[in-house]
């Protein structure tokens, strides 16, 4: 039987004790299945643990079993497991943010709430489902939201970009509120924000501002709660330098969700009007703002220039050698925010 793609079988494990080794990490996670890979990420110079690692199971069902058994505690410390983000997604704004709300695009007129519920309830407990309609005509605007009681169903669903719902191709993404997008953009600008990617140009991984946030030799090690760092074998790394979303980016002034094009909406001008507090309060008016290009090419969702994944290109072996960070500088890049992963 052909094995499922690695991206569906890999977990990022944050918050590891510096005493945790590959052996103890493996011993802990093997209670849910066979591991095909296990690594604790270490500083290439000092060999000191960087406080996170990755485990890869032999099947997605084993990953599901492990995530269903949270919280996890290893060597006396509660760790934070999360489905690893694949390289091609890792640099997109919000890729590492933990949310319980899922955006669903490509909803057709004949798709009702029960279709979404029937499809998505297999992933986890659903709190709410919203299909957005035009306030005047009552027609569906082509998108909606599904909110779960936990972040893991969302993380699992977005591993697969397209889903067939009621016979139609739908695209899924994490739904980020305006505040969450501002935090992402704050981190992108190097101000640190809640994500603490910081500047990171001075090789070694400066995790955001303030004392104690230098991951290499910093006294509090876990990046002052500001994020984790680099990629491993193409997974989970932080954004490549200034290319956090790249250009056109997540609606960064260009186009946005449906911006001027037909998009998924049926009005030919984006999703129109404001909704909730999402995307800068501007799901439309010609753009879906902070969510990225949802134009005629659904794949242009928060694009990032290919190849600019931390400039590392996985040099120096399967774990990316020592060159993990933005622009190939050796900086750390960052893995999401304080407790958002």
UniProtKB/Swiss-Prot annotation:
**Linked residues for Glycyl lysine isopeptide (Lys-Gly) (interchain with G-Cter in SUMO2):** 10, 92, 100, 108, 125, 140, 156, 161, 174
Modified residue Phosphotyrosine is at which positions?
A: 319, 335
- Residue positions of the PTM N6-acetyllysine? 156, 161
Which residues are reported to carry the modification N6,N6-dimethyllysine?
A: 92
- What PROSITE patterns does the annotation carry? RRM
Note the coiled coil stretches, chain numbering. none
Q: Which domain of life is it from?
A: Eukaryota
Q: Which residues form the RRM domain?
A: 9-92, 100-179
> Quaternary state and partners of this protein?
Identified in the spliceosome C complex. Identified in a IGF2BP1-dependent mRNP granule complex containing untranslated mRNAs. Interacts with IGF2BP1. Interacts with C9orf72. Interacts with DGCR8. Interacts with TARDBP. Interacts with CKAP5. Interacts with PPIA/CYPA. Interacts (via C-terminus) with FAM76B; the interaction results in retention of HNRNPA2B1 in the nucleus and inhibition of the NF-kappa-B-mediated inflammatory pathway.
Q: Where is this region: Disordered?
A: 181-341
Q: Which UniProt keywords apply?
A: Acetylation, Isopeptide bond, Methylation, mRNA processing, mRNA splicing, mRNA transport, Nucleus, Phosphoprotein, Repeat, Ribonucleoprotein, RNA-binding, Secreted, Spliceosome, Transport, Ubl conjugation
State the protein's purpose.
Heterogeneous nuclear ribonucleoprotein (hnRNP) that associates with nascent pre-mRNAs, packaging them into hnRNP particles. The hnRNP particle arrangement on nascent hnRNA is non-random and sequence-dependent and serves to condense and stabilize the transcripts and minimize tangling and knotting. Packaging plays a role in various processes such as transcription, pre-mRNA processing, RNA nuclear export, subcellular location, mRNA translation and stability of mature mRNAs. Forms hnRNP particles with at least 20 other different hnRNP and heterogeneous nuclear RNA in the nucleus.
Q: How is it modified after translation?
A: Sumoylated in exosomes, promoting miRNAs-binding.
Bias (Gly residues) ranges: 190-211, 308-341
Query: What's one Pfam family the UniProt record gives for this protein?
Result: HnRNPA1_LC
Is the keyword Transferase in the record?
A: no
Positions carrying Asymmetric dimethylarginine = 191, 201, 254
UniProt xrefs under PANTHER family: HETEROGENEOUS NUCLEAR RIBONUCLEOPROTEINS A2_B1, HOMOLOGOUS TO DROSOPHILA SQD (SQUID) PROTEIN
Full protein name: Heterogeneous nuclear ribonucleoproteins A2/B1
What are the recorded GO MF terms, alphabetically? miRNA binding; mRNA 3'-UTR binding; N6-methyladenosine-containing RNA reader activity; single-stranded telomeric DNA binding
């Amino acid at each position: 039987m052909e094995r499922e793609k690695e991206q569906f079988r890999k977990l990022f494990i944050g918050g590891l004790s510096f005493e945790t080794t590959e052996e103890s990490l493996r011993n802990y996670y093997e209670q849910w299945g066979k591991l095909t890979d296990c690594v604790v990420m270490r500083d290439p110079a000092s060999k000191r643990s960087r406080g996170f690692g990755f485990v890869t199971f032999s099947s997605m069902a084993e990953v599901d079993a492990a995530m269903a058994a949270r919280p996890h505690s290893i060597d006396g410390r509660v760790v934070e497991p999360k489905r690893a983000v694949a390289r091609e997604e890792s640099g997109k704004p919000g890729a590492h943010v933990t949310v319980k709300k899922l955006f669903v695009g490509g909803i057709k007129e004949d798709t009702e709430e029960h279709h979404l519920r029937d499809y998505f309830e297999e992933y986890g407990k659903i709190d709410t489902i919203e299909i957005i309609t035009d306030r005047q005509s009552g027609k569906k605007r082509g998108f909606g939201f599904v909110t779960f009681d936990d972040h893991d169903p969302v993380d699992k669903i977005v591993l697969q970009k397209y889903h067939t719902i009621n016979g139609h191709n739908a695209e899924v993404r994490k739904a980020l509120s305006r505040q969450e997008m501002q935090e992402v953009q704050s981190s992108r600008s190097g101000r640190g924000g809640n994500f603490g990617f910081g500047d990171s140009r001075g090789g070694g991984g400066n995790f955001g501002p303030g004392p104690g946030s230098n991951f290499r030799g910093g006294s509090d090690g876990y990046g002052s709660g500001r994020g984790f760092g680099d990629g491993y074998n193409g997974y989970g790394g932080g954004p490549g330098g200034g290319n956090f979303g790249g250009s056109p980016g997540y609606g960064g002034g260009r186009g946005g969700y449906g911006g001027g094009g037909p998009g998924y909406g049926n009005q030919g001008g984006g999703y129109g009007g404001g909704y909730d507090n999402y995307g800068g309060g501007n799901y439309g008016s010609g753009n879906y703002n902070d969510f990225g290009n949802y134009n005629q090419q659904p794949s242009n969702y928060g694009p990032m220039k290919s190849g600019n994944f931390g400039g590392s290109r996985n040099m120096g072996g399967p774990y990316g050698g020592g060159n993990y960070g933005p622009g190939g500088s050796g900086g750390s890049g960052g893995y999401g925010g304080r407790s958002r992963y």
